[in-house]
Amino acid sequence: MAEVIGYYGTGRRKTAVARVYLRPGEGKVKVNGKEYESLNDYFKNPAWTKHAIEPLEVTNTLGKFDLVIRVNGGGLSGQSGAVRLGIARALLQYDQNLRPVLKKYKMLTRDPREVERKKYGLKKARRAPQFSKR
């Protein structure tokens, strides 16, 4: 079997995990085994799509790679952030010289914000039950 040249990156955001493979091509997109015209067909929201493909835009590599993405967990917003980090990390495997550009736009930083856990005695993480003086 012929070995396919590709670049791999893992991205995480909130509870979403994305495994991204970049393969030299003309910009085809495959998410969770299903072919899409563009990422916009998967994310539906143009803001999430723009956020996800930003690493390709700032490095002028948009249309040079086919994207094969496996993403699970979280919602579409978290998945968008996970895909973004995965693409950025895969681009580093492709060319280490892209690091300063990606670093400048903070695309190699994993967003550490997670949902705060709910505490007992409270309605949510911080929301206390209503208090009545009388």
From Swiss-Prot:
InterPro entries in alphabetical order: Ribosomal_Su5_D2-typ_SF (IPR020568), Ribosomal_uS9 (IPR000754), Ribosomal_uS9_bac/plastid (IPR023035), Ribosomal_uS9_CS (IPR020574), Ribsml_uS5_D2-typ_fold_subgr (IPR014721)
User: Which GO CC terms are listed, alphabetically?
Assistant: cytosolic small ribosomal subunit
Q: Where is this region: Disordered?
A: 114-134
Q: Which GO terms describe its biological process?
A: translation
The secretion signal range is none
Pfam families (UniProt xref): Ribosomal_S9
Query: Mind listing the UniProt keywords for this protein, alphabetically?
Result: Ribonucleoprotein, Ribosomal protein
Q: Which GO terms describe its molecular function?
A: RNA binding; structural constituent of ribosome
Question: Ranges of Basic residues compositional bias?
Answer: 120-134
Q: Which Gene3D superfamilies match?
A: 3.30.230.10
Q: Mind telling me which HAMAP family this protein's record contains?
A: Ribosomal_uS9_B (MF_00532_B)
Which NCBIfam families did the record assign?
PRK00132.1
Q: Which family does it belong to?
A: Belongs to the universal ribosomal protein uS9 family.
The protein's name in its UniProt record: Small ribosomal subunit protein uS9
Q: Which organism is it from?
A: Thermotoga sp. (strain RQ2)
Q: Which gene encodes it?
A: rpsI
